[in-house]
């Protein structure tokens, strides 16, 4: 039995942001890393929706929006410069212009970002909550003390000949948000930022963990809540219609075939793979199925079936 009643998953900016062409953000919609949705699905498949909460610290939430606004300004300026250069090059040979439909100036885009950010939160597919940063006097004093003494996540940064001990203020706000909101439950930060490493994974508090990918999140939750890969695949068989159709297709059933009365016979796991035997009714006939499924790759590796002899059926 887990020593925690709840787990809180916190997303850092560098994990949530989704970029294309190397470094460009999607400016017309609030797009997040596809791994975010993988984590949502994983929590459902693990049967942990009542125990795990997805959280976005408000500092991260504001930073995601600010990055969009800054990128819009930069890209708009860059495009205008290129258009002017093209006009000079082509002269009367071409008519070159660009028209913005909804966002004529920067203030329009700032309002637009607020709208698409809220649309993201309102999407039924998204189950994250925005977690406010603690603003009480004790928290502020602790953050200031950490900044003065360059205690992680603060660090000394150089600019010219000067040294600054308050680099990492944003990270400090995120950390104290996590610390306050998690309390004595399990807190997991999903981030690619190494500056957090000294504060997580037991070095600061035993209930705070850090990782940077979906598989590690799954491993932490599996260990803390005693969930096996076999358990997860069993849940998938009862909830994932696409997986059932893949199994039926591999076993050469017709496309519109339906499976009823599915019952697990045995289930064992080996690393990321699960081997499952189950029985089910197909058109009133009882079959025995054997499958191998890779949970990390979400891939059906093997599937076979045979009719169960009625004289041997349970």
What are these regions, as identified by a protein language model?
Residues 2-185, 195-312:
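Active-site-proximal, substrate-binding regions of enzyme catalytic domains
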Residues 188-192:
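Acidic beta-strand-to-loop metal/phosphate-binding motif
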């Amino acid at each position: 039995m887990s020593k925690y009643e709840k787990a809180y998953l916190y997303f850092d900016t560098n994990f949530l942001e989704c970029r294309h062409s190397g470094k460009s953000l999607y400016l017309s919609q609030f797009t997040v890393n596809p791994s975010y949705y993988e984590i949502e699905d994983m929590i459902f498949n693990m049967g942990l929706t009542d125990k795990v909460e997805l959280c976005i610290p408000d500092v991260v939430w504001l930073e995601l929006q600010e990055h969009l606004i800054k990128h819009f300004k930069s890209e708009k300026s860059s495009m205008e410069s290129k258009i002017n250069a093209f006009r000079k090059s082509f002269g009367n040979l071409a008519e070159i212009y660009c028209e913005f439909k909804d966002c004529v100036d920067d203030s329009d885009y700032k309002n637009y970002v607020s709208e698409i950010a809220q649309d993201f939160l309102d999407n039924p597919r998204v189950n994250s909550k925005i977690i406010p940063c603690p603003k009480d006097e004790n928290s502020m004093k602790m953050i200031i003390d950490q900044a003065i003494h360059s205690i992680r996540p603060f660090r000394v940064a150089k600019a010219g000949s000067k040294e600054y001990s308050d680099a990492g203020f944003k990270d400090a706000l995120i950390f104290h948000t996590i610390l306050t909101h998690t309390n004595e439950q399990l807190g997991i930060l999903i981030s690619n930022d190494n500056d957090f490493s000294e504060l997580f994974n037991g070095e600061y508090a035993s209930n705070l963990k850090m990782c940077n990918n979906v598989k590690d999140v799954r491993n932490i939750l599996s260990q803390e809540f005693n969930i096996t890969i076999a358990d997860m695949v069993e849940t998938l068989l009862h909830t994932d219609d696409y997986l059932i159709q893949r199994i039926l297709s591999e076993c050469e059933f017709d496309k519109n075939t339906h499976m009823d009365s599915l019952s697990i016979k045995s289930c064992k796991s080996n690393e990321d793979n699960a081997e499952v035997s189950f029985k089910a009714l197909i058109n009133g006939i009882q079959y025995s199925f054997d499958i191998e499924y890779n949970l990390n790759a979400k891939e059906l590796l093997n599937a076979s079936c045979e009719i169960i002899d009625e004289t041997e059926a349970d």
